[in-house]
A protein has these predicted regions:
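A solvent-exposed, charged loop/short amphipathic helix patch at secondary-structure junctions
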Residues: 20-42, 84
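A long, amphipathic alpha-helix that forms part
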Residues: 35-63
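Active-site metal-binding loops of divalent metal-dependent hydrolases
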Residues: 14, 72-73
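Structured beta-strand-rich core segments of catalytic domains in phosphoester-bond hydrolases
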Residues: 1-24, 158-169
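Metal-dependent phosphoester-hydrolase catalytic domains
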Residues: 57-68, 74-170
Length: 170
C-alpha cells in the first residue's frame, strides 16, 4: 500500500452562545425545533454548513487525500445524547445537528469510533474543571464539545482519548 503523503486539516472554533445544554438544563427547553433555532442563532449550524460547502471538492477526493476537521464545536455530539445517557444530560436525548452534518457526509467521529458507549466513556471536554455553573448555581452540564472528525481510506484510528488538566489556567 502507498503511504499517505498529504492530508487536509481544518481547525474550527464554532460560535459559543447560546449554548444548547444551558438552554436544556437551565431554561428547561425541550422542543427540538427551538433547539435547532438555538444552534442557528449561535452561528454553529450555518458555520458547519459553510465549512462543508467549502470542503465539497476535498470530500469527493478524501480517499486519495484524507481530510480532518477538529476543534471546539461548542455543541455536543449527536452520538452522545442517547436514551442511556439522558440522565447525564438533564433528561435530554436531543440529536445535535452540527455533528450530524459531518457524519451525513461520511466523516467519522474519531473519539466515538474508539469509545463506542457514551454512557461508559463520555469523553467530556466541557467542563471537567467546573462542577457548578456560577451563573445558575446548578451543576455544570458535562459534554464532549471538542471533537475530531476524519474521512479517507487507509486511515487507522489507533486511539483517541481526552486529556484534562487539574484546574483553571491563570
Amino acid at each position: 500500500s502507498n503511504p499517505i503523503k498529504d492530508i487536509i486539516v481544518w481547525s474550527i472554533h464554532l460560535g459559543p452562545y447560546p449554548y444548547g445544554p444551558y438552554e436544556i438544563c437551565f431554561a428547561g427547553v425541550t422542543d427540538s425545533t427551538e433547539l435547532v433555532l438555538i444552534d442557528s442563532l449561535s452561528g454553529r449550524l450555518p458555520q458547519i454548513n459553510s465549512l462543508v460547502s467549502t470542503m465539497t471538492q476535498y470530500i469527493a477526493n478524501a480517499d486519495s487525500i484524507p481530510i480532518f476537521v477538529g476543534g471546539d464545536f461548542n455543541t455536543p455530539s449527536h452520538q452522545d445524547y442517547t436514551a442511556a445517557t439522558a440522565s447525564d444530560h438533564c433528561g435530554s436525548t436531543y440529536q445535535w445537528p452540527v455533528t450530524q452534518v459531518l457524519t451525513d457526509i461520511g466523516m467519522i467521529d474519531a473519539f466515538r469510533e474508539i469509545h463506542l458507549d457514551p454512557g461508559m466513556d463520555p469523553g467530556n471536554t466541557w467542563s471537567p474543571i467546573y462542577e457548578i455553573n456560577s451563573d445558575n448555581n446548578l451543576p455544570e452540564p458535562q459534554d464532549r464539545i471538542n471533537l475530531i472528525f476524519y474521512k479517507g481510506q487507509n486511515i487507522t484510528n489507533l486511539t483517541c482519548d481526552v486529556s484534562t488538566g487539574n484546574g483553571e489556567v491563570n
